[in-house]
Amino acid sequence: MLRRTLFNLLVPATLLLGLAPALAESRLALVIGQSAYKSVPALPNPANDAKAMSQLLTESGFAVTAASDLSQAQLRDKISEFAGQVAAKGADTVALVFYAGHGLQIDGENYLVPIDVDPKREADIPIQAVRLNDILNTLTSAPSRLRILMLAACRNNPFGDISKSAGGGLALVDATFGAP
């Protein structure tokens, strides 16, 4: 079922990008699977999702960087490194980031959850998680032809015992068309 879902997501992207890679176009992908959480429920599927997505993207002509079970510092570093790779390839680059793991929103702000998160109270979550807008800002700082962010985030609040304001699922992200 996951392969069908991933396939259904990639078909429109493939059609959008064209069936054959353009000669001047570079396609870079960062695929992240977060499964081995230390203080919140582990998720077996993200590792499998990331592996399947890496294979599909490679078959679609992307140069894939795969990463799994990243701490907060590693997640931030990996996003920054990827943005640097995109910038180095130039403005004709197609950049795709796929994230599978825990994600949540608090008061309308989206967060991706690194494996080393260990909040003792709700106020710790934004400090220990990675804000989705920070990732978006980093990606938009690198000139590229197209940026795609795909999230397969678990909708269950992993911090239910300490966080009552975290919503189920992520908040709507309003991407600006043609953003730099």
Regions found by a protein language model. Give the residues of each.
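Bacterial N-terminal signal peptides that target proteins for export
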Residues: 1-11
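Caspase-like (clan CD) cysteine peptidase catalytic core
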Residues: 26, 64, 76-99, 104-164
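Active-site-proximal C-terminal subdomain of hydrolase catalytic domains
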Residues: 33, 45-46, 50, 54-58, ...
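Second-shell loop/turn segments in exported
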Residues: 36-44, 63-69, 120-126
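Short beta->alpha linker loops
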Residues: 70-74
